[in-house]
């Protein structure tokens, strides 16, 4: 079918293409089968999903069980197609702009977030983004699974990607879309925050892997608005966090639950993003989350589960920063208490060690120097902060006087 640009858009976000799938595939849309399984459900902040399966027998203790491979498909080279559904999308919309920029940056050489999934099979040699498309047909009055499946199938057919195991169709519905409540419903259904059970999910219907990504700003804070950043800078935090969650899970488990899943985990959902959602708060944890810088901008993101690390990590290129304390002067035999501060983007705990401390002083693994200096002198102290795959040192002078 003919594709035409929707209109000018920010230079850093590719311009969408206008299509009308309902005009071209109306019969197929009405007859779409419902044979998929919803997975990777991102619940609203503070809520849990309903267990979809019994827990598998395991010798590990949750939430620290690793993902296991179920023998099914895995995307070796993910390709993302962003499908904006509805006539009300505009070039200036913050959600569509954020999504286009996010997907354009994922897979690029500066992306050390997607590469957490390398251990499960996906590989990245450039941007995963295949473009933004706008289906200008109005969504049904109430959108259900069969509608989303039909939309994904029609798009896949129009683009020649039906049956492509590496293809992801992300269906981003326009603001105000109402969703069926038989699966719990979207937390911002019909344009306002509510008691819905999900923020997004992904599935496979036998033809193509697709994501149901409603208009996240309709749900507000319960789907991540200002989750990481304050004010206007955090408006689309939930958009990038949740879109990234579903993207990583579709890459590692495109035909759920046959890919990489922790089958013992019935609390979070058990996929690579589920175990770390909202900082792991579903499990009562404090997993890594924060801003991730890609070639196309900086985005709020959650961490992903790493079997190699045995926990949630935010990046495969960890960086540690350590704050140099001012030079110290201590009176002989007086008690010392000095905290060394460091941070990391990896999501791992930072531990400390020190060399050449004044006699009688020692540093704990959390960076607290304590004790009583028992010898006069001048020392050049070096403190090193270490995390998984990275370390950083700083030095300062410490004098012990009478």
Regions found by a protein language model. Give the residues of each.
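Acidic, Ser/Thr
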Residues: 340-345
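Strand-loop-strand motifs at the edges of beta-sheets in extracellular beta-sandwich domains
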Residues: 359-374
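C-terminal edge beta-strand
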Residues: 392-401
């Amino acid at each position: 079918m003919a594709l035409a640009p929707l209109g000018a858009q920010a230079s850093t976000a590719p311009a969408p293409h206008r299509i009308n799938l309902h005009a071209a595939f109306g019969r197929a849309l009405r007859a779409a089968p419902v044979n998929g399984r919803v997975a990777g459900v991102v619940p609203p902040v503070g809520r849990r999903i309903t267990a979809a399966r019994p827990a598998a027998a395991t010798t590990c203790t949750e939430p620290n069980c690793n993902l296991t491979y179920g023998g099914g498909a895995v995307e070796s080279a993910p390709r993302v197609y962003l499908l904006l559904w509805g006539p009300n999308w505009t070039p200036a919309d913050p959600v569509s702009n954020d999504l286009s920029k996010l997907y354009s940056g994922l897979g690029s050489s500066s992306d050390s977030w997607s590469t957490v999934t390398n251990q499960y099979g996906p590989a990245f040699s450039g941007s995963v983004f295949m473009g933004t498309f706008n289906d200008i047909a109005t969504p049904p009055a109430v959108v259900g699974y069969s509608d989303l499946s039909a939309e994904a199938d029609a798009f896949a057919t129009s683009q020649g990607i039906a049956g492509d195991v590496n293809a992801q169709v992300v269906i981003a519905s326009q603001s105000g879309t109402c969703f069926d409540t038989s699966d719990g419903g979207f937390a911002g259904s019909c344009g306002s925050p509510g008691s819905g059970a999900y923020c997004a999910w992904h599935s496979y219907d036998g033809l193509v892997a697709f994501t149901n990504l409603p208009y996240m700003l309709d749900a507000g804070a319960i789907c991540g608005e200002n989750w990481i950043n304050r004010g206007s800078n955090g408006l689309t935090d939930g958009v990038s966090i949740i879109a990234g969650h579903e993207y990583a899970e579709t890459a590692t488990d495109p035909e759920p639950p046959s890919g990489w899943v922790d089958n013992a985990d019935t609390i979070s959902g058990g996929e690579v993003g589920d175990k770390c959602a909202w900082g792991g708060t579903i499990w009562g944890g404090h997993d890594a989350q924060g801003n991730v810088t890609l070639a196309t901008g900086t985005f709020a993101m959650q961490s992903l589960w790493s079997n190699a690390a045995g926990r949630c990590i935010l990046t495969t290129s960890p960086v540690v920063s350590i704050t140099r304390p001012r030079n110290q002067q201590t009176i002989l035999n007086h008690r010392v208490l000095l905290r060394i501060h460091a941070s990391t983007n990896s999501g791992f705990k930072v531990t400390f060690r020190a060399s050449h401390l004044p006699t009688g002083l020692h540093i704990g693994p959390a960076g607290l120097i304590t004790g009583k200096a028992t010898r006069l002198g001048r020392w050049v102290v070096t403190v090193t902060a270490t995390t998984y795959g990275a370390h950083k040192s700083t030095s300062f002078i410490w004098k012990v006087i009478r």
